Amino acid sequence: STAIYGSKSANGVIVVETVRPEPGRLRVSYSGNFTYQTPDLTDYNLMNASEKLNFERLAGRYTAKSIYDSQDELDALYYSRLKEVRRGVNTYWLSEPLRAVLNHSHNLYIDGGDNAMVYGIGVAYSNDDGVMKGSDRETMSGNIKLSYRAKSLIFTNDFNIDVTNWDREPVDFFTFAQANPYYRKYNDDGTVPELLEDMNVAGTTIYNPLYLYNIVNTNKTGEMSLRNNFSIVWRFLNAFQLRG
């Protein structure tokens, strides 16, 4: 059995043959599966805008630590953020890139034949979207199997094709998790600002993850695989078989 089926079959194998369809009639089978997924953010316990700003102040974020730091600029940065907090800004970023999704998969198989020839044709499709917006995967596959029996010989050909396409989210979840709650998502006119803050301290540029998310970009990957297996089985003495 090792020579025929590989090293994992050293202790022996059990060969199972499916029930042949009734001669002259087609047999059709279908299966489908639907799943609903929704993100769960209950484990995240983040500081609100006021708590985060006060934490940064106590940690010395707005205190000059060297001659290269400008205390005036740090004070201006702190009070501009405090102004946002006092006007009611308290942004929850985590839910922005997430969504609830309904995924589905389908399998259709048709087979038929007679005592000598058996054939089967199968197609499958699955749509697997992630809870991150823009994270999608689509899989399609097909299969054609032919089996011909001539006395003690069985000729089998099995052809398979698989096509997979997937998209990745343009901005990762961690980028949204890092965005501070005292930043506004939108301008007063409803537009999405490119930067979360006009002030640029110590060369740090803070981009709005929503703006990055809405930039037209493509992050697609696809692959296709083809497989064809042909085998001949010779059964003899009612107890032995050779496979090639």
Describe each region flagged by the PLM.
Residues S1-K8, T38-T42:
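N-terminal plug
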Residues R20-K133, E169-F173, N208-N219, V233:
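Residues embedded in well-ordered regular secondary structure
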